[in-house]
Amino acid sequence: KPNNQDACLFYKACMEKEGINETKAKEFIDYQTTIDFLITNIDRHLNNFGILRDSNTLKTIGPAPIYDSGNSMLYKNYLESTPLDFMSLKVNALCKSESLLISKVSDFKNIDFSKLPTKENVKDFYKKDVTLSYNLERMADTFEYKKNIIRILSNGVPYKTVESEIKHLISKNESNNSTSAINQIIEKNGIESFLHSLEGSKIR
């Protein structure tokens, strides 16, 4: 890849070169990026995605399904992280931070919010591994927080605007400095109310 070329655009161009049309290529990149954001996968390096081919004919089938997402769901982050920490995570991926990656997503239509796991679903799934019992609540809160951020972004709100509003909420009250607290604010007032507060933040 040329050093001066955007990595996401380069990957999309590679898929197009292999016969995957531009729309399908962009939709897949948006989908993969959104899923990685939701599960806090910080290791989508260049060997962790690719193009699927027919093993007999070598004909391109399409983007390879998402695989190797092991470095996710706070896999080694044992300390409490703040909402703003999760807004600026460094990643080993097509961009160097989650914020840059998710800001490149132009459409979240491939995400059916009604089918995403609830907080209780997340805890029920991960409690099957007894070694994770100490961290279940935080894992579930983080997933819910990421889900709420995606719901807001899907309404066309820029990532930086969301980050600015969360900073404002924390500056108003230090008790808001946790993912569970931000979740409670969003869920208590509703997404529409939060979006309205974002409109107000533009004049602050």
Regions found by a protein language model. Name each.
Residues K1-N41, L46, G50-R204:
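Anionic ligand-binding catalytic core segments
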